[in-house]
């Protein structure tokens, strides 16, 4: 399970040793960092599976084959430098897929991993607020044209973003397929897609909406 981390730490050590003075000390820091990331990722995974967002999740013998591929993909995200919050979301997705009896469809996890692993905190905040707004609209039964954007934009402004920053952030998030741009209201706006609600059932996105 930790081979990717081992290889990544070794590569970092080789690069540092080649190009930087005081390399032996710095190489040790690189190795220690890789080991720290491995431990953190393992703790996050165990925490989410044992007592996380979906409660306790028990894996069965028939889960072994898909789980090997899924954990390998999770570990690749660790090796690629995914932040703690992103790794927690990925672990929640794994637990959610098991809970929803979708674990055998490994493509599902690969899709969500590709979306979540490198999102920034700002982008995650946009997703959290977007999901909360969609659920508020659904619960109120008041879905009208452009209602989603008319709620999302001021919510992000209240969080401290300028209109230009909001446009850039939403454009960035739209690459994931969770938001899509619309141009029928005089200016470019954004709308959530069904993927957002589906992801929200697997990972605690709404908790990210606080700022």
Which residue ranges define each predicted feature?
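Non-transmembrane, amphipathic alpha-helical segments
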Residues: 7, 34, 59, 75-82, ...
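Long, helix-rich, hydrophobic modules that act as membrane-proximal anchors or helical bundle/coiled-coil regulators
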Residues: 87-211
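Residue-level detector of well-ordered alpha-helical segments, enriched
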Residues: 7, 21, 25, 41, ...
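Amphipathic, membrane-active segments
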Residues: 32-77
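Short secondary-structure junctions and interdomain/linker hinges
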Residues: 15-18, 52-56, 60, 74-85, ...
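Membrane-inserting effector segments that mediate pore formation, membrane fusion
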Residues: 1-48
């Amino acid at each position: 399970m930790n081979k990717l981390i081992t290889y990544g730490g070794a590569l970092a050590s080789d690069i540092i040793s080649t190009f930087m003075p005081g390399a032996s000390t710095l190489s040790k820091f690189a190795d220690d960092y890789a080991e720290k990331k491995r431990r953190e990722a393992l703790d996050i995974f165990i925490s989410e599976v044992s007592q996380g967002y979906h409660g306790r999740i028990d894996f069965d013998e028939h889960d072994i084959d898909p789980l090997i591929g899924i954990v390998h993909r999770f570990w690749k995200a660790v090796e690629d430098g995914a932040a703690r919050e992103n790794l927690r979301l990925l672990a929640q997705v794994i637990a959610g897929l098991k809970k929803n009896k979708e674990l055998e469809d490994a493509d599902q996890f690969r899709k969500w991993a590709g979306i979540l692993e490198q999102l920034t905190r700002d982008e995650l905040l946009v997703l959290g607020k977007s999901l909360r707004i969609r659920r508020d609209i659904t619960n109120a039964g008041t879905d009208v044209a452009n209602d989603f954007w008319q709620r999302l934009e001021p919510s992000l402004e209240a969080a401290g973003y300028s209109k230009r920053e909001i446009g850039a952030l939403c454009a960035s998030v739209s690459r994931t397929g969770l938001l899509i741009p619309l141009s029928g209201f005089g200016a470019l706006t954004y709308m959530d897609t069904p993927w957002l609600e589906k992801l929200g059932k697997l990972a605690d996105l709404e908790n990210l909406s606080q700022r």
